[in-house]
Each structure stands twice: as C-alpha cells, then as structure tokens.
C-alpha cells in the first residue's frame, strides 16, 4: 500500500486500470518480465547481503526499534487520538534525537545520565495531512520511552528532565499525578499543554499532552492514563545489554536487502536524523528514519504512513518504504485498494515493462528531492519510492522491481 505520508506527498485519489496479467482466482502469479530490458539507469538491482559487522551507533538505533514493540498506542489513552503525527513516531537512539521532541535544554540531562535508547509515539484527534500541529487546535499526545543504564539513572533523569523543562518559563507550575507520587509534571495555567516524566525501573516515560483548552483535570487525567497503559507493557521487553548492541542484526528477514538502496552496492545503515530541534518542548521537530525494519507493533504505530492490515513488517529509508504481507493475495488486495484512490490528473508515465505499478506527480516545493513517486507490487511485497524527477523515479522503480524479482 501507499503510506498516508506517501499519499500526502504524492496527493493520490481515484482509479487506475490493472497493468499485469495475473491469475484472478487463487494465488496471484507475478508476470514474467525480461529484467535486462528494464531501464534502471545507474541504479543497481542485484540483491545485497547485510553486513555482518556493526557498531554501537547502529546498535542503539536497532535497540530503539525493538522498544517500539512495547510502546502504547495513543488510542489506549484517548480513543479520539486515531491519527498519527508526521515524523513524530520514531526510534530515538540518542539524546540528540530525543531532545528534538522534548527540548534542547533537556539533552544534557539525557547525556549525563547515560540514555541508551528510546522510542516516541504521537497521536492526534485531527488528520493533520502532513502539517505540523498547532497547540490548542486539537488534542495531541506524544509519549517517549527512554532506557537508561539502571534504575537510579532513570530516577535522576526523570527528575532533571522535568526540572530543566519547567525552568524554561517562570509561569510553569508543578502538578501532581494521582496514583503516581514519584512522577514529575508541570504546566502553564494559560497554555493547554502538560509535560510529565516518570521512572519505572531503568525506563523513563515522558508524556507531552495538549488539549483544546487549558483544562488541568483533563490533562492530568491524560498523563495518568499514559502511565497506566505504558507501565504494564514494559514487562514484555528484554533489553539487549549495552555491550551487545553491536551484535544486533542489521536486517530482518531480508527486508532491507529487498529495498532499493540510495546507491548501487551501498548498504543503508540504521540512522535517525532529527531536524528543527526546539528550544521548548512542542511539536515542531521532525525525525527521519533510514535503514530500519520495524516489527508488527511499531509498524502499526506509524499511523502517519497509513499502513493497512494485514501488513506484517516494513523496511524504511525515509520516504522509500517496502511492505511485506502474509501472502500475495493480501498484498494485491491492499495494492488495488490504494490505486483505486488515484486521481487520473496526478498520474505520470510508469516505467516501461514493469507490471503492477503506478506513478504520480508530487505536490512539493520545487527544491524538494521528492518530485514524483511510484508504487509497485511483486508477490507479497509492495514498495513506494520517490524521486527528484519522473525519469528518476521511473528508473528507481524499475530497479526496485528487478531487485524484488531477483530476491525471490
């Protein structure tokens, strides 16, 4: 399927005819294509094998991805928070990436207490359609789960994180969270937001809640439900010892090996890039994720991508996404539903010789590297890619298709 984020960038919305001659009853059979005849430009289409050596830097990203499997879903806290917030749900491997969501001044607290890994999830009661949230215009929630070396480090970090953030404004007032005497929280009575931290074992749960009005009771209730929902999930997580971070595998089920890399023969290593680090805690930061394979739960928490069940797992390289379904039947069903939403006015030429594909124009800034996008199906896999021009994305998509075929 095409992700909501991909749809937002590509602006898709009506119908396109089926391009390949697949069997209509039972298991679809991929059409045979002469791969050597495809125009792949300079893009490689030979499968790669994941490197067997890693390091602590990449391992922190991979451990953060693992933490995504025990994150709460914002709808567990507030059933209205059904929409994702673009680029606000992601692994947080470093204090820098976490500070991008919290506040730059909090970074020192995370560093001094040895933050190891983390994950963030966000939700909204309004479909923001790729736009940044506006405080007061909707209900919003961001929850961070941060891992520290031990219980003491987590307790000290939770206290310092709250104190540092609260000190940014003299109008901040301490708040108590019922049922959690060890929690730290604050808010400004004239602003409809509240921030809170709570240490549980070697983890810190950080919550940033926003409402449509400065209602302390509503906000404290939201924070309390965050802790209620998140704490039980932590018992299911078995943390990797920090000294073993570099042993975590760089790929899962060959997913990254099947996703077109940014350069021929260049493995995309796990990376998270934070932009627009905010002085104050808020919703202006953006996190871009590269070279990771998300597990089933983290995949479904990435609501801004709009993944559709019965998706299993996804590989992500920023705007390029590879999705795996249980079988070819379910993959085709989701793919067809997505392309039935395509607006014919947005269509551009698809790569010659590639079956089951459609391409569209992108509504983006002329300086953006994402000027066109394609969505292609092969077997139980679908891939969505972007490019800096129609010709570029057509070649990339042809290479992606060939890579999927050759990967089996």
Predicted segments — roles?
Residues 1-10:
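Bacterial N-terminal signal peptides that target proteins for export
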Residues 193-199, 203-208, 212-213, 293-407:
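Long compositionally biased, domain-poor regions of proteins
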Residues 117-156, 302-337:
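A short acidic-to-branched-hydrophobic micro-motif
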Residues 40-42, 67-94, 183, 187-204, ...:
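Short, intrinsically disordered low-complexity segments
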Residues 26, 146-149, 161-162, 195-249:
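Hydrophobic, ordered structural segments
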Residues 23-133, 220, 226-227, 231-315, ...:
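N-terminal "mature-domain start" segment
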Residues 18-21:
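C-terminal motif of bacterial Sec signal peptides marking the signal peptidase cleavage site
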Residues 92-113, 123, 137-140, 150-197, ...:
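Short Gly/Thr-rich strand-loop-strand
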